Amino acid sequence: MPPPPEDEAIAHKGHFYGVYLLCSQSLDSRYRAKCYVGFTVNPKRRIKQHNRGCDFGGAKKTSKKGPWQMVMIVHGFPNNISALQFEWAWQQPTLSTRLKIFPDLKRKKPKETHFDYNFRILNRMLSVGPWHRLALTIRWLETDYERAFDLPIPCHMEIVSGKVSISASQRKLEEATGTAPPVAWAHECHLCMQSIEQPERSRLGCTNPTCRLTCHMLCLASYLLGDEPGQYIPIGGECLLCETRLSWSALLQRKRLQLGVPEEMQDNEEEDLSDDGPDVDSDVEVQEFSD
């Protein structure tokens, strides 16, 4: 497989969950500029399936209504369930209990395009829980559609441009994201000063490879939560040794990769990335988590 272009991000196979927005480029005025929201673990393969039709793994709602462009994708979800919850709410903003505080989402505004309406829904979603605490990446895939959000998004989220490639290579991922483990570990937790039992599973450190920060997972989580009463999952914070900015989701992602534990592959993801195996979007009802 040829290496990805230099401006293309690399995500690890089995750990990527994305919710994307398609826009139709159909010459038929009935379908042109219509939008579709879906879930994928492999963006490149998914857009090919949509454009080939439902007989090749595409969705019924997009079949024969293209060609389609995948104009943006939101990723960084901790698991497929979280991503599917997000997809469902984006598809059904009037049914989502979390979006009822935004009555303006009930319908498209006059002269508002389908893309603008879906972008407005996304903007509101990123400002409410549980999504506003996730370290999500909003990735523009087509520069013609790029625009600024009306409501500011949380500062721990990223807005980037460029394609994303799925790789099974641990070396490629470490080179692209700097997820290599620290040069050395301490024997005791820097926070509670107790020894760490089963370090392979319960130990976390800094993302700076030259930093020797060594902590119990729960100790570091409590430290990063700081003065956030009522919260159980941290967003991030500064390393207590080197002051590197830490992302909790990035720390957990690195731990999974070090353990070699793949996440569940949604919709029977095939081993061969070139294979057109099923990658079906969730047309079935997905229930929201209760508060």
UniProtKB/Swiss-Prot annotation:
Compositional bias of kind Acidic residues: 264-291
One GO cellular component term noted in the UniProt record for this chain: Slx1-Slx4 complex
Documented EC number(s): 3.1.-.-
Keyword annotations: DNA damage, DNA recombination, DNA repair, Endonuclease, Hydrolase, Metal-binding, Nuclease, Nucleus, Zinc, Zinc-finger
SUPFAM superfamilies: GIY-YIG endonuclease
GO BP terms in the entry: double-strand break repair via homologous recombination
ZnF region ranges: SLX1-type: 189-242
GO MF terms held by the record: 5'-flap endonuclease activity; crossover junction DNA endonuclease activity; zinc ion binding
Keyword Phosphoprotein part of the UniProt annotation: no
Listed InterPro entries: GIY-YIG_endonuc (IPR000305), GIY-YIG_endonuc_sf (IPR035901), Slx1 (IPR027520), SLX1_C (IPR048749), SLX1_endonuclease (IPR050381), Znf_RING/FYVE/PHD (IPR013083)
Group of enzyme by EC: hydrolase
Subcellular location: Nucleus
Major site of localization recorded for this protein: nucleus
Function in brief: Catalytic subunit of a heterodimeric structure-specific endonuclease that resolves DNA secondary structures generated during DNA repair and recombination. Has endonuclease activity towards branched DNA substrates, introducing single-strand cuts in duplex DNA close to junctions with ss-DNA.
Family label: Belongs to the SLX1 family.
Protein name (record): Structure-specific endonuclease subunit SLX1 homolog
Species assigned in the record: Drosophila pseudoobscura pseudoobscura
